[in-house]
């Protein structure tokens, strides 16, 4: 599906609401312990911030963590985001021309749609086959684990 062919119903049908692979009843503390990480206030606050913002920038997380905890350094937030990403609790995405974003939806191989006008990002489920959704014509001996696809277009708000 190319952005030129998007319409309200096809776009709405492919966008997903952000979900985490952790059970709905799991607390941030449970999630951290389950990943073998120490439970710290900045880590808990960062998980909460990313969960609330879906595709949060580091600045979004910093603002939220500071609102919750008070003084926290920029470096501390970047360290937390790095640790949570390395542990597989967050996924870092980097749409071209946009700051890195963090999301809690991990463990699957979904893709993203980005509005060229306002930068809104939505999740798009893997549309064909099993992960990684795309089969390269030549894998050069690699074992392909994921494929990253970014759809670009205009969201409903920016089209009106």
Identify the role of each PLM range.
Residues 44-49:
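Pre-recognition alpha-helix immediately N-terminal to the DNA-recognition helix
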Residues 73-74:
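Short coil turns linking two alpha-helices in DNA-binding domains
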Residues 56-65:
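Short acidic, hydrophobic short linear motifs in intrinsically disordered regions
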Residues 77-87:
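Basic amphipathic alpha-helical segments that dock to polyanions
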Residues 1-23:
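Short, intrinsically disordered or compositionally biased N-terminal tails of bacterial proteins
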Residues 14, 23-36:
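Short, Lys/Arg-enriched N-terminal segment that forms or immediately precedes the first helix
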Residues 39-41, 52-57:
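Short capping segments at the starts of secondary-structure elements
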Residues 87-160:
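Non-DNA-binding regulatory cores of transcription-related proteins
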